[in-house]
């Protein structure tokens, strides 16, 4: 005949069950950050990233495009990073995690934001699309400060690299095309600590319009599939 456990034992069993339930609930997957900051490249406008922003919005995310002014490299990338900071302060609530996607020069401006103003606890995912992380030979054709920052071995590029270790919990992704004639060599768009992907997109400007690239971004930043 089974005996009813004493009240103290029943209480202990109930507490154990409650603790187990709490732990199991705590292991449920976290909802991915909803806010996505999109930073366009040199000579680009907010319209350049319209297709990507629309796809992210359709996936239930909240994209914000940061149109850089001026967008022609006339000022240094560290200065432009302040515009990214201002947009984040306006559109992303304090202490809320978010992701950043930078295209071309915008990827370097976004990295400068991380170095100067970013909080590692808030950056969930960093994606760069055809950004010259190791510089581009094309930058030798202009003496504009922002373009000089994109020259191989520039002081700017040397300054942003050492700060990457602070963002060890951030998911880093780079996407490039081996056919790029703006970022030379195209391998400059990779980072040693990132997951580096390559898609055969015909031209540098088409990277943010190509459906494969847009789908990759949505897949990485959007909510996980149900079931």
Predicted regions and their residues:
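Hydrophobic alpha-helical segments, especially transmembrane helices
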Residues: 10-11, 112, 205
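Short, motif-level signal for alpha-helix interfacial/capping segments enriched in acidic residues
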Residues: 17-21, 156-159
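Bacterial Sec-dependent signal peptides at the C-terminal "C-region" and cleavage site
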Residues: 18-31
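Serine-dependent carboxylesterase/thioesterase catalytic core
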Residues: 34-40, 46-47, 51, 55-68, ...
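Helical cap/lid subdomain of alpha/beta-hydrolase-fold lipid enzymes
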Residues: 115-227
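N-terminal export leaders
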Residues: 3-14
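Residue-level micro-sites within transmembrane alpha helices that shape
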Residues: 8-9, 110, 179
């Amino acid at each position: 005949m089974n005996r009813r456990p004493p009240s103290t034992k029943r209480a202990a069993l109930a507490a154990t069950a409650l603790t187990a339930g709490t732990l199991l609930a705590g292991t449920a997957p976290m909802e991915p950050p909803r806010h996505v900051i999109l930073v366009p490249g040199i000579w680009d406008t907010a319209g350049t990233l319209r297709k990507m922003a629309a796809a992210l919005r359709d996936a239930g995310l909240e994209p914000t495009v940061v149109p850089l002014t001026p967008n022609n490299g006339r000022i240094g990338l560290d200065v432009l990073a302040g515009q990214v900071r201002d947009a984040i302060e306006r559109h992303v609530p304090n202490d809320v995690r978010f992701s950043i996607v930078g295209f071309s020069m915008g990827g370097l401006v976004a990295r400068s934001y991380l170095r100067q103003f970013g909080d590692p606890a808030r950056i969930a995912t960093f994606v760069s699309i055809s950004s010259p992380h190791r510089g581009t030979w094309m930058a030798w054709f202009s003496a504009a400060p922002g373009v000089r920052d994109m020259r191989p071995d520039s002081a700017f590029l040397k300054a942003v690299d050492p700060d990457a270790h602070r963002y060890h919990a951030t998911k880093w992704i780079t996407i490039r095309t081996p056919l790029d004639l703006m970022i030379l060599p195209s391998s400059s768009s990779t980072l040693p600590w990132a997951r580096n992907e390559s898609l055969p997109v015909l031209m540098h400007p088409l990277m943010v319009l190509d459906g494969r690239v847009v789908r990759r971004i949505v897949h990485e930043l959007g909510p996980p599939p149900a079931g």
